[in-house]
Amino acid sequence: MAEFFSQYVPTWLAYLLAALVHCVLLIHVVAVGALVFIWLERKVAGRIQDRLGPTRVGGKFGWLQTLADGLKLITKEDLMPEGADAVLFRLAPYISFCASFCAYIALPFSDGWVAVELNAGVFFILAVMGLEVFGVILAGYSSASKWSLFGGMREAAQVVSYEVPMGMCVVVPVLIAGSMDLVQIGRLQEGFLTNWLIFHDPFTFITFWVYFTCATASVNRAPFDLAEAESELVAGFHTEYSGLRWSFFFMAEYGSMFAVSGLAAILFFGGWNGPLPISDWLTLTHEHGPVWGYLGNFLGMLNFMFKCVAGVTFMMWARWTLPRLRIDQVMKVCLKYCTPIAAVMFLGAVVWTYYLPEGATGARRPYAEKLYRPAGDEAAAQSRLSLRESSGDPLSLGDRTHRRTAQDDAIFRGAKDDEPRDATSRQPGHRQGSAPATYREEASFR
């Protein structure tokens, strides 16, 4: 997007406009997503409790009930308890919402639809989502209420404890993929359903369930919602909030639910990739125009959204099915079960990846082809070479050299390539058995 704006305005202004457009789009995604998820939770709760749920506002299914509730909250009076810290009391809900919102900056909705592609996107999301607890603590501290303070203290202890096993679970797919870039991890899982990392080995399968348990606790959802236990703390840390500020806490909660579900979809369930292989939309973009590329990204986004909504629905189902735990039981689940299991899964994934890099399916994973994605003129050139080779047209020495150079670049990126080198694949001027010039240049650079 910055490249598009740079055609008409200076470079610094182009990047600023691109950042503003991304912020506006992401804010609407979080806000609209929260409205949809609130309506969905009401319908799920009604279904589990043998009720109908919203049925009056917006037709038979109550589509506009959440919007009506939002308008009601906007028109409500903003109250503040006597003795509260005015600055911190007003600031707390915005801190929680901003922390939840920032997680979407590095979350890819499709192969080409991501605000910022970060090399450490996994840990960026975990770091910014960990900041949400500061808003909860400030809300409890500044409300001048013992119920709010108890809720904030519970949330702090719970989030800090569950981030340890959750971080270890996230490292397992990162270790297998060899990258912390979420886009690269998603590209690695292209192809059939068996290429998804959850089916790589038994350890990743168990790791997903430990991750999802810890993620449910980190976003303060039942049965781990001790910070807002109605039977003990009235309403928890947001007891004294009303109106629009109260709604910011709920938008942050549902936004975090979608974010952790999206992270699980990328790390374990193929991200935007479907269960069946589809065409290489990047190659179609260069051969048939950008319309096919946009169509591919849109289909990938639909796959990603379906997986995220499935994860959010599972959290809602757990809330209305399982009873709330006591605070000592919540900490026991973390320290006695989740943390040791996550540590064992991490060690098991290390050993499995070292001795059996093919994974549980037995299929060789072409890391070099998946992690290396050519673009621009190089992608078009390699596409033409593939078409010529598939049609039986013999490739010249220059064509084979071009293909071998691209594979060498993929090896330098940390990928694997077990294809043997022959005399025709060497660059011109190299001696038999000597390292290519790119290898010598890389060694001298280091």
Segments from the language model and where they lie:
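Selective transmembrane helix interface/packing segments
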Residues: 1-389, 393-422, 426-446
